[in-house]
Structures are given as structure tokens and as C-alpha cells.
């Protein structure tokens, strides 16, 4: 039912391996498409954050004074989640939830 929608292209055609659109609901399909666009835009902004830091350098000072984490510390992955105080993580999650609901 969605073979003629925007983004469907050869040679794959309509691609939904997990069956999110199996119910055939056009409203559900449009909501999923909008969600995919939002997530793509957030990912692009995150990538620009990495590029900006490489070009301009990182801020002086502490990201988390209580844990001794500076802005220029190189912390990646799960270790980054452990080092940041819970209030900071809640702030990130609330901000992302607000973006998702907008």
C-alpha cells in the first residue's frame, strides 16, 4: 500500500523488515516518517557538535565539578554516562523528550 510513497526507490522498493506498517494505517505511516525525519535532524545536529568542537576547541572549565570532569576530557561511550551526574542526564533526557514531543 506504500509502494508509491516518497523515499521508495529501486532496487529495494518499499523496505519495512520489522513490519511497522503491517496494519496499513496511513496515519501511522506518516507519524513514523515524521519521527524518522526528527531523529535524522537530531543526529545531524550531534554531528555538527563534534565537528564544531574539532574546529574551535572545547570550552575551558568543568562539565561536572563534583566528579572532576572537565570539558576537554576525552570520555566516550558508557564511561561518559557514568561520569556525568544524574541531574545532567535527566536534563539531557528531558530536552530530548521535549524535542520529540514538539
Curated annotation (Swiss-Prot):
Cofactor descriptive note: Binds at least 14 chlorophylls (8 Chl-a and 6 Chl-b) and carotenoids such as lutein and neoxanthin.
Topological relation to the membrane, as annotated: Multi-pass membrane protein
Protein role: The light-harvesting complex (LHC) functions as a light receptor, it captures and delivers excitation energy to photosystems with which it is closely associated.
Organism: Amphidinium carterae
Location (main, coarse): plastid
Binding site for chlorophyll a 1: 36
Family: Belongs to the light-harvesting chlorophyll a/b-binding (LHC) protein family.
Name of protein: Caroteno-chlorophyll a-c-binding protein
GO annotation terms (biological process): photosynthesis, light harvesting
Oxidoreductase listed as a keyword: no
Intracellular or extracellular location(s): Plastid, Chloroplast thylakoid membrane
Residues that hold chlorophyll a 2 according to the record: 39
Domain notes: The N-terminus of the protein extends into the stroma where it is involved with adhesion of granal membranes and post-translational modifications; both are believed to mediate the distribution of excitation energy between photosystems I and II.
UniProt KW keywords: Chlorophyll, Chloroplast, Chromophore, Magnesium, Membrane, Metal-binding, Phosphoprotein, Photosynthesis, Photosystem I, Photosystem II, Plastid, Thylakoid, Transmembrane, Transmembrane helix
Pfam families attached to this UniProt entry: Chloroa_b-bind (PF00504)
Entry PTM: Photoregulated by reversible phosphorylation of its threonine residues.
GO cellular component terms given for this protein: chloroplast thylakoid membrane; photosystem I; photosystem II
Gene Ontology MF terms in the entry: chlorophyll binding; metal ion binding
Known partners and oligomeric status: The LHC complex consists of chlorophyll a-b binding proteins.
Transmembrane intervals: 78-98
Keyword Plastid part of the UniProt annotation: yes
Amino acid at each position: 500500500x506504500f509502494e508509491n510513497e516518497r523515499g521508495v526507490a529501486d532496487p529495494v522498493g518499499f523496505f519495512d523488515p520489522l513490519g511497522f506498517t503491517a496494519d496499513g494505517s496511513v496515519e501511522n505511516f506518516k507519524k513514523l516518517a515524521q519521527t524518522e525525519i526528527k531523529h535524522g535532524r537530531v543526529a545531524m545536529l550531534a554531528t555538527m557538535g563534534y565537528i564544531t568542537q574539532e574546529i574551535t576547541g572545547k570550552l575551558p572549565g568543568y562539565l561536572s565539578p563534583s566528579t572532576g570532569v572537565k570539558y576537554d576530557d576525552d570520555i566516550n561511550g558508557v564511561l561518559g554516562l557514568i561520569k556525568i551526574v544524574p541531574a545532567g542526564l535527566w536534563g539531557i533526557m528531558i530536552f530530548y523528550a521535549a524535542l520529540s514531543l514538539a
